[in-house]
Design a protein with these regions (language model features):
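Short alpha-helix immediately C-terminal to the canonical SAM-binding loop
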Residues: 18-19, 66, 94
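A short SAM/SAH-binding and catalytic strip from SAM-dependent methyltransferases
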Residues: 55-68, 88
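Active-site capping/gating segments
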Residues: 89-124
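A short acidic, Gly/Pro-enriched loop at the edge of an enzyme's catalytic core
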Residues: 42-56
């Protein structure tokens, strides 16, 4: 939001994560612009939340979960011409995430590593 996003949707399956996100948003004075809710990729796609896709999607989840989410529609959240930033990936799991993303016609545009952890940016 502070970098110019008009709307932001934060979704997690864990209600405590949503509580923490709300507190962080209020601390950073962006609470009113942020939509938060408990849900899943499938629930986003069927319209439980105000929008079903975005130009930028961010997921900070362990690699095996990211791979499963690609099978559950994660790539469908990305608007045409958009990107997804994936983090929470161990270096040795990078290949499996790349393969899952490429199977959904995403292309890696950037990656970064810090210690054993990797973050990938994929584009549609």
């Amino acid at each position: 939001i502070k970098l110019g996003a008009e709307k932001v949707l934060g979704v997690d399956i864990d209600s405590e994560s949503i509580v923490n996100s709300r507190e962080n948003a209020e601390t950073n004075e962006v609470g009113e612009e942020l939509i938060l809710g408990v849900g899943s990729v499938a629930e986003i796609l069927v319209g439980k939340f105000p929008f079903k896709s975005a130009p930028l999607v961010v997921a900070n989840i362990l690699a095996p979960v990211i791979v499963r989410l690609f099978d559950g529609g994660l790539a469908d959240l990305i608007e045409d011409g958009g990107s997804i930033i994936l983090s929470g990936i161990l270096q040795e799991q990078k290949k499996s995430v790349l393969e899952a993303a490429q199977a959904k016609h995403l292309t890696m545009t950037e990656w970064r590593q810090r210690g054993d952890w990797v973050a990938l940016t994929m584009s549609r």
